[in-house]
């Protein structure tokens, strides 16, 4: 008699399916970069556009060189594969968008760290870039080059009004379309594209963003800062990183029930960290989720799928945690 076992794993139908997922993300990132350039040209930000193009080209060249060296070490000599079956272009675009005006040595180190993580942790793909971005942000912090709206608001103990917030970034257009913080509008458009192409685990993205939105909206009401939710969603590259790194297909939950819980839990963590270490909040949250939480949820995924009582209980606990989080943030900040 054949014995059956329950396997908590992510299954991809074929190697071709994996390539399709990578291709969809790559296409969307190319469109994102092109639209960012076009929008900033229309806004008259020519200097920023040149800096962005330079950053992307440098990132692509450096990533290609080191990826090819890795291929040589592995005794693979198919250069075409680097761009057609690997995440080289996608990783280059993400790092390039994050490293505008960054020192080339730091850019190179960030790429090396990204590729190192990607190759030692075989299941990680696009989210490996988080480790490189982490290095870039830490460098900016220690060189006093991290004067972003998030850090300025924190340094002012979150006591700023709507007009002061707009002045930080020279108007609302730079929040919505600005090159420095990765346009939330374009991020939403790319999410719609990936959702349409069935290339993203939308349950995770929606539950994550919805959790953060609820917490920030209620915090804004209780502290007389109705603008707070829009500020949080449009800064710190929150939407961009959520769409491109939160749902890495091999290291994020696969079943709908666990995906929703995953998004809610990480949303609570991010909301708290936005008040403590704002620029690193999303990065640290996603890394934590991939290293610890995702594996645990996958281990209990079968129980959650077929034991609705347990699943509903966990959802209720999550809602209680959201309320507690709002109360604590309102009292402290």
Enumerate the predicted regions with their spans.
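Structural signature of hydrophobic alpha-helical transmembrane segments
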Residues: 48-62, 100-109, 170-185, 224-238
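Long hydrophobic alpha-helical segments that form multi-pass transmembrane helix bundles
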Residues: 122-192
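Hydrophobic, membrane-inserted alpha-helices
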Residues: 29-33, 63, 67, 87-96, ...
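C-terminal ends of transmembrane helices
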Residues: 6-13, 66-80, 113-124, 188-199, ...
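A generic, well-ordered mixed alpha/beta core segment in the N-terminal half of proteins
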Residues: 83-152
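N-terminal signal-anchor module of multipass membrane proteins
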Residues: 1-72, 324-333
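Central hydrophobic cores of alpha-helical transmembrane segments
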Residues: 130-135, 204-213, 259-268, 287-290
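Loop-to-transmembrane alpha-helix initiation sites
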Residues: 125-130, 229-238, 258-261, 276-289, ...
């Amino acid at each position: 008699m054949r014995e059956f076992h329950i396997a908590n794993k992510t299954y991809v139908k074929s190697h071709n399916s994996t390539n399709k997922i990578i291709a969809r993300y790559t296409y969307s990132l190319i469109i994102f970069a092109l639209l960012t350039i076009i929008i900033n040209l229309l806004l008259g930000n020519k200097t920023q556009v040149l800096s962005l193009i330079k950053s992307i080209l440098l990132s692509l060249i450096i990533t290609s060189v080191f990826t090819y060296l890795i291929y040589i070490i592995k005794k693979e000599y198919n250069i075409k594969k680097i761009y057609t079956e690997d995440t080289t272009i996608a990783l280059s675009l993400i790092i390039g968008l994050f490293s505008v005006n960054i020192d080339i040595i730091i850019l190179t180190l960030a790429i090396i760290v990204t590729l190192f993580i990607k190759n030692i942790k075989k299941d990680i793909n696009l989210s490996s870039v988080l480790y490189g971005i982490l290095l870039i942000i830490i460098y900016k912090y220690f060189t006093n080059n991290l004067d972003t709206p998030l850090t300025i608001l924190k340094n002012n103990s979150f006591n700023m009004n709507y007009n002061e917030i707009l002045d930080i970034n020279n108007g609302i257009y730079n929040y919505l379309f600005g090159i420095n913080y990765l346009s939330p509008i374009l991020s939403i458009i790319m999410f719609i594209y990936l959702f349409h192409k069935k290339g993203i685990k939308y349950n995770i993205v929606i539950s994550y963003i919805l959790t953060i939105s609820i917490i920030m909206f209620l915090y804004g009401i209780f502290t007389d800062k109705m603008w707070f939710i829009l500020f949080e969603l449009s800064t710190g590259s929150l939407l961009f990183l959520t769409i491109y790194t939160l749902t890495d297909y091999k290291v994020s939950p696969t079943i709908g029930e666990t995906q929703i819980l995953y998004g809610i839990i990480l949303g609570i963590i991010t909301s708290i960290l936005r008040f403590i270490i704002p620029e690193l909040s999303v990065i640290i949250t996603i890394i934590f989720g991939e290293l610890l939480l995702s594996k645990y949820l996958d281990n209990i995924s079968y129980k959650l799928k077929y034991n609705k009582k347990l699943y509903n209980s966990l959802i209720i606990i999550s809602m209680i945690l959201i309320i507690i989080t709002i109360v604590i943030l309102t009292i402290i900040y």
